[in-house]
């Protein structure tokens, strides 16, 4: 198992030691770096793309360079990583991209670019599923809603606003998302491809 990280090298190395995996620092905005990372990882059975950033603010006032960086990380990186991984995958490989329920629903202002980037992943999965299907390689998107992480803690300032949109009024847990990813990576999901798998407590319902 190889995973990449951007910051927090100490946390990455701890995780690598605990799991017997290899941590590689990488910039997901760097196309050539993303391609090299996948290429240098050797033969791949499963690729999980989990890099992403968000921007908040009025679209009329946002910095164009920041928007371009968001698109490089949230759209270009998953595309190039997926294509490069497919070159190295055996028949029956798995590509799983972590998107967001905001690809389906954006109920608040100030996140147009983020929502666009997550909607783009839906087209990526549908298109690459057609391209890679003859080799039995599946391509799916997991679309979490609010998940209790350092980036979006349940006790954060957005809790009440987000929970008002949800049927299950709590943040999801990382292990719930991981369970969906593990199922998609397994043999039971060999006929599941080009699909969006939303895990959001009905945030998008």
Q: Where are the predicted features?
A:
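Conserved glycine-rich Rossmann-like NAD(P)H-binding loop of the short-chain dehydrogenase/reductase
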Residues: 1-12
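The beta1-alpha1 cofactor-binding region of Rossmann-like NAD(H)/NADP(H)-dependent oxidoreductases
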Residues: 25-36, 64, 175
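Substrate-binding pocket helix/loop in short-chain dehydrogenase/reductase
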Residues: 58-59, 63-71, 162
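Active-site loop-to-helix junction immediately N-terminal to the catalytic Tyr of the SDR YXXXK motif
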Residues: 62, 106-115, 127
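Active-site helix of classical SDR
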Residues: 82, 117, 125
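Alpha-helical segment proximal to the catalytic Tyr-Lys
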Residues: 87, 130-134, 190
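C-terminal substrate-recognition "lid" of short-chain dehydrogenase/reductases
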Residues: 88, 170-199, 203-204
């Amino acid at each position: 198992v190889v995973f990449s990280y951007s910051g927090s090298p100490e946390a990455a190395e701890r995780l690598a030691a605990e799991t017997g995996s290899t941590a590689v620092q990488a910039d997901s905005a760097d196309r050539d770096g993303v391609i090299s990372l996948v290429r240098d990882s050797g033969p791949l059975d499963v690729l999980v793309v989990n890099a992403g950033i968000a921007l908040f603010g009025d679209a009329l006032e946002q910095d164009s360079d920041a928007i371009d960086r968001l698109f490089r990380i949230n759209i270009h990186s998953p595309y190039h990583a997926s294509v490069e991984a497919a070159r190295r995958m055996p028949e029956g490989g798995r590509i799983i991209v972590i998107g967001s329920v905001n690809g389906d629903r954006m109920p608040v202002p100030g996140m147009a670019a983020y929502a666009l980037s997550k909607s783009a992943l839906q087209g990526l999965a549908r298109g690459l599923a057609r391209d890679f299907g003859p080799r039995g390689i599946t391509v799916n998107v997991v679309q979490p809603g609010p998940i209790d992480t350092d980036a979006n803690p349940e006790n954060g300032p957005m809790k009440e606003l987000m929970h008002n949109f949800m049927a299950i009024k709590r943040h999801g847990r990382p292990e719930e998302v991981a369970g969906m990813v593990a199922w998609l990576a397994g043999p039971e999901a060999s006929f599941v491809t080009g699909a969006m798998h939303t895990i959001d407590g009905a945030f998008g319902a």
